[in-house]
Amino acid sequence: MPPAPATASEPPESTAPLSSSTAATESTQPPTPPAGANPVRSAVRLWLSAYRVEVMLFLIAFAVLSSFSSQRFFRQSAAPHFIYQAQSWLEGRLDVDPRVLPNLEDWACVRVVDGHKVRCEGRLLRDDRWFVSFPSFPAVVMLPFVALHGYQFNDTSFGVFVGALAVALFYSLLRFLAQEGETERNRNDNVVLSLVLAFGTLFFYCAIRGEVWFGAQVMGVALTCLYVRNAVKARRPVLAGVFYSMAVLTRTPLVFAGLFFVLEALCPGPDRLAQLKALPTAWKPAFRKLLLFGAGAAPLALLAAAYNVYRFGKPGEFGHSYFYNNRVNADIDRFGLFNLEYLSRNIQAAFLKLPQVSLSPPRLSYDPHGLTLLLTLPLLVFLLVPRTRPRLHLPLWLTVAVCALPGLFYQNTGYMQFGFRFSLDYTPYLLLLFAIGGWSLRNRAVVAVLALGVLVNFWGAVAFRGYTEFVRNW
């Protein structure tokens, strides 16, 4: 469903197309319900009037994504890890029952040897404990649905729903930024940019698959939109902290996105250097915002840390070091989860890998280790030469930089994938940079690049064959 209003005073959107000069004043007061009208019906009507664009974007995205999901839409994916985690919680256990696992792909297995927790090796033992080796918040979201459907809950159609919701939330974020004067985009521009997220980025193929890897990335985008909306100018620090913790417990690299709130709290601009110099004598307002942000993030963070200690003995360990019988274990044992050793291959996956063209027979294919972002997100070229550098230019770029670092030094490129899927963690920030960068969506070069991005990601949505197809031989 589309996002609820952030405050009771947030005005609805005008139905008329707007010029960029009136982007920040695009609202009118909601219509007054007639006397004696049903209050629930009136409230729904007012809400739909205020958020009709979000509703339409949700419906369009849901229809297109579900269509491209095709037969996957009606079946659980072959990597439903979060469903098994949620069902285990409902059964009163913190591990998962190995007897019901659908496969052994990317599950953590822990064995206690001489009082120490180690990865299971060789023949499995009765006392070995099995866990989902991914941050657990998506399983929390799935809990009520798994309570109804059990192990049979369909994570693929759920992922399509979350993907459509993320598109609506991204539009809501863009509209909010326009109303706050942070961008000069009008309603039509914001609609186009929301559709670019949906169908002109790697979000497209990730949102139609289900599967533990892609489902978490899509949910991370939705939670990022909610986090950024509340973090701008550090206006709602508690809510920003709550959504930040949800995002981090969905996609761990988003822990670095906390920098965005810190910058908004300490030095929102425009004269950031002067604001930083003044902090020693005027620190209380910023400190209060940071404290409230921490208070919002702390409950889920503490629960996750305790859960990790119970499972793996360390508060920051989600389980990848305990992968059972996995191809990445040799690298993890030698270099760890993050290392400079991995930088070269991740740079190649993110920026250098090109489509593979064969003339005999004619064939166009992709490398499942990655595909250059210059094709999957060609709008990048305009970010390097922005026409304007407004207040959010620096914090958004710094957030992109720190969120990109984990994926570049990680032991895995994201294989199997279409494009460098780890970039989806910071794709919303990149699109926001374009939104504030001053390039017109009517510019011919921009239109050509947008069309290229949609074409390439259409190819990815149609052509990518991942774990589900491999297992089921579709």
Protein language model features and the residues they cover:
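Membrane-proximal envelope and lipid/glycan-remodeling enzymes
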Residues: 1-6, 10-474
